[in-house]
């Protein structure tokens, strides 16, 4: 696989980044969207999984999780830190995700955490098309966008959320939720937008129940 331009600077800093990534929890990172994620057991794909913090947390909750990470050094750290988690690691990268698309599996939840900003705007259409192909009917796409100055040696683009929302709509993905939050690592100049989309369900097919919806159904009503 050709090394994606967006991974520049990550391989050589993998060990230091692991400390940073693992210093915050899955619950903290996903708090704005988590209640709208599918209830377990669901099929989950974490793209740009880094050190596997989120993938391992979701697997521990009972989901079937695939972690896609194109940087070998980060992938190796993740496999070491979260050995025995049940996460299946693969090598693939946006914008086209050729291996995952060719595999044909579809997912109830696709995570794109701190990844979208590494793609140039002209890569977004093909990336969104690939993401849509990987979503099951009524599947959900959780995407975060970083805003702020670009660190030295990294390839990032500080873009507003609106073009991404419009592009997702063009691919049949409905915006379910939008939120903003401060940076969890205390960088005052950095903030984040969190977006959750849903793919249209097939006619007559059962919808994917979210955590909050599942919690509303008590044992006596199931």
Pin down the residues of each PLM region:
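Short catalytic micro-motifs in class I SAM-dependent methyltransferases
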Residues: 114-115
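Conserved acidic residues
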Residues: 108
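Class I (Rossmann-like) S-adenosyl-L-methionine-dependent methyltransferase catalytic domain
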Residues: 1-102, 119-126, 130, 140-222
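A conserved beta-strand element that flanks and buttresses the S-adenosyl-L-methionine
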Residues: 111
């Amino acid at each position: 696989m050709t090394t994606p331009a967006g991974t520049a600077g990550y391989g050589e800093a993998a060990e230091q980044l692991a400390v940073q990534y693992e210093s915050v929890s899955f619950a903290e990172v996903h708090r704005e969207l988590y209640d709208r994620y599918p209830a377990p057991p669901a099929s989950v794909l974490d793209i740009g999984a880094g050190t596997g913090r989120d993938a391992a947390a979701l697997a521990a909750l009972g989901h079937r999780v695939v972690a896609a990470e194109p940087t070998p050094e980060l992938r190796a750290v993740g496999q070491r830190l979260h050995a025995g988690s049940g996460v299946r690691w693969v090598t693939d990268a946006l914008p086209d995700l050729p291996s995952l698309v060719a595999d044909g599996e579809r997912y109830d939840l696709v995570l794109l955490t701190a990844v979208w900003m590494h793609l140039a705007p002209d890569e977004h259409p093909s990336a969104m098309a690939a993401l849509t192909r990987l979503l099951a009917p009524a599947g959900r796409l959780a995407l975060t966008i970083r805003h702020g100055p670009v660190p030295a040696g990294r390839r990032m683009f500080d873009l507003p959320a609106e073009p991404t929302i419009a592009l997702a709509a063009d691919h049949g993905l409905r915006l379910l939720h939008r939120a903003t939050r401060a940076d969890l690592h205390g960088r005052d100049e950095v903030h984040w937008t969190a977006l959750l989309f849903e793919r249209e369900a097939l006619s007559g097919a059962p919808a994917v129940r979210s955590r909050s919806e599942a919690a509303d159904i008590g044992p006596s009503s199931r």
